[in-house]
Regions:
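N-terminal Rossmann-fold NAD(P) dinucleotide-binding loop
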Residues: 152-153
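Hydrophobic Val/Ile/Leu positions in short beta-strands of Rossmann-like dinucleotide-binding domains
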Residues: 144-145, 168
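Phosphate/pyrophosphate-binding betaalpha-module
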Residues: 203
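Rossmann-fold dehydrogenase core element
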Residues: 165, 191, 198-200
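Glycine-rich flavin
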Residues: 2-139, 167, 172-176, 180-183, ...
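Gly/Ala-rich phosphate-binding loop of Rossmann-like dinucleotide-binding domains
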Residues: 156, 160-161
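Glycine-rich Rossmann-fold phosphate-binding loop(s) that bind the pyrophosphate
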Residues: 3-4, 146-149
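Short loop/turn elements that form and flank the Walker-type P-loop nucleotide-binding site
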Residues: 139-140, 162
Length: 222
């Protein structure tokens, strides 16, 4: 049972589309370094809408691939919502009707959504969630990324490479805190070398929004 797109968050709104965006940024960076490879390239630029369109296309193709595999392996698929009405009964609600399914084993794979942080609520214009960052209407001149987990760092790298003045704020003592310390240290050095600002042991306390701009109040320890 799936309410939107087969493949869930990772395939449609997470690691797959971000990797497609990062690939575009990587090629853009390589083109800017063409001279290092004995090549000549002039007026190198990017079209943000085309970059995003490619990313969404990649996600869509893979989602359709999952749909194909479901049909090939004769897995019955419902596009709708599921509600547990008993320990062994699921009520499936689709656009057309409702159906009860009884099963001994039920797997809850609910996916994820962006958590609303008090005082930092997203509006899709000045303050984004990951979904807004995957479908930007314009390229920001400055970008503050709160959190340096995998997806936060991916967005920071993408927008920094394409020219946004990017700052990353991480509440603990190092970026990519779930990775090995050596990996975090190496990544930090590379990102700083690329012009990214990184604030560790830092907390965004509140945002002031006025006249199309956001001012972040950041408290940093150490």
């Amino acid at each position: 049972v799936e309410d939107k797109h087969l493949g869930g968050i990772c395939l449609n709104w997470g690691c797959i589309p971000t990797k497609a965006m990062l690939r575009s940024a990587e090629v853009f960076l390589l083109m800017k370094r063409a001279g290092e490879f004995g090549l000549t390239a002039e007026k190198i630029n990017y079209d943000l809408s085309s970059v995003i369109s490619r990313s969404r296309k990649v996600a869509k193709q893979l989602s359709q691939g999952v749909d194909y595999l479901m049909k090939k392996n004769k897995v019955r698929t419902f596009m709708g919502e599921a509600v547990l009405t008993a320990p062994d009964i699921v009520e499936v609600r689709t656009a057309r009707d409702k159906e009860l399914i009884k099963a001994r084993n039920i797997i809850l794979a609910t996916g994820a959504r962006a958590r609303e942080l008090p005082g930092l609520e997203a509006d899709g214009d000045l303050v984004w969630t990951y979904r807004h960052a995957l479908q930007p209407k314009r390229m920001p001149k400055k970008l503050l990324v709160i959190g340096s987990g995998a997806i936060g760092i991916e967005f920071a790298s993408f927008y920094n490479t394409l020219g946004a003045e990017t700052t990353v704020v991480e509440v603990v003592s190092r970026i990519l805190p779930l990775e090995d310390a050596e990996v975090s240290d190496f990544a930090r050095k590379q990102f700083v070398k690329q012009g990214m600002d990184i604030l560790e042991k830092a907390l965004v306390e509140k945002l002031d929004r006025k006249k199309g701009l956001v001012t972040a109040h950041i408290k940093q320890n150490g």
